[in-house]
């Protein structure tokens, strides 16, 4: 079982782990940003709100290896390029680093976002240096010619 991240208050922003009853609100947010995403019951879904409105969301999906996969980081179009994603992901990674049971967090970054993830502490990784389940997803993405970059926030 993974450590659960607490609620954070960051100036006027609030980052929370979304409970199962509120997942539909995050699904609606993703839809409003033209993301075709449906949050699963077992996903750790986090949102960042401002003035009571969701302005960013991300999912941490547990893998067989016990590590997490960061998926579907999304910021409302009107709030982009203002450090919102940095606030959200930064708080999640900080909590993971200090969790009772630390785990690594991996993601598949679009090429133009590589430097963003590097600035948060992610490193570009080769498939042979990650757990098998993470590498399998990477190889499927490569087969689909998605061009995503395998990255990891390595704690352990």
Residue ranges and their predicted role:
Residues 71, 80, 116-119:
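Acidic/histidine-enriched, beta-strand-rich ligand/metal-binding domains
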Residues 47, 53-61, 66-74:
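Conserved beta-strand in the GNAT
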Residues 111-143:
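Conserved active-site alpha-helix within GNAT-family acetyltransferase domains
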Residues 1-40, 47-50, 148-150, 154-156:
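Short amphipathic alpha-helix that is part of the acyltransferase structural core
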Residues 96-111:
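Conserved GNAT acetyl-CoA-binding A-motif
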């Amino acid at each position: 079982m993974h450590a659960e991240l607490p609620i954070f208050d960051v100036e006027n922003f609030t980052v929370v782990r979304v409970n199962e009853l509120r997942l539909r609100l995050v699904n609606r947010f993703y839809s409003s940003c033209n993301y075709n995403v449906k949050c699963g019951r077992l996903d750790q879904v986090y949102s960042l709100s401002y003035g009571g409105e969701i302005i960013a969301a991300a999912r941490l999906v547990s893998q067989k290896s016990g590590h997490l996969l960061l998926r579907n980081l999304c910021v409302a179009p009107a709030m982009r390029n203002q450090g919102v994603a940095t606030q959200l992901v930064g708080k999640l990674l900080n909590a993971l680093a200090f969790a009772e049971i630390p785990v690594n967090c991996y993601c598949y970054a679009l090429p133009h976002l590589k430097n963003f993830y590097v600035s948060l502490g992610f490193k570009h990784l080769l498939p042979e240096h990650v757990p098998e389940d993470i590498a399998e997803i990477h190889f499927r993405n490569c087969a689909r010619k998605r061009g995503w970059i395998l990255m990891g926030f390595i704690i352990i």
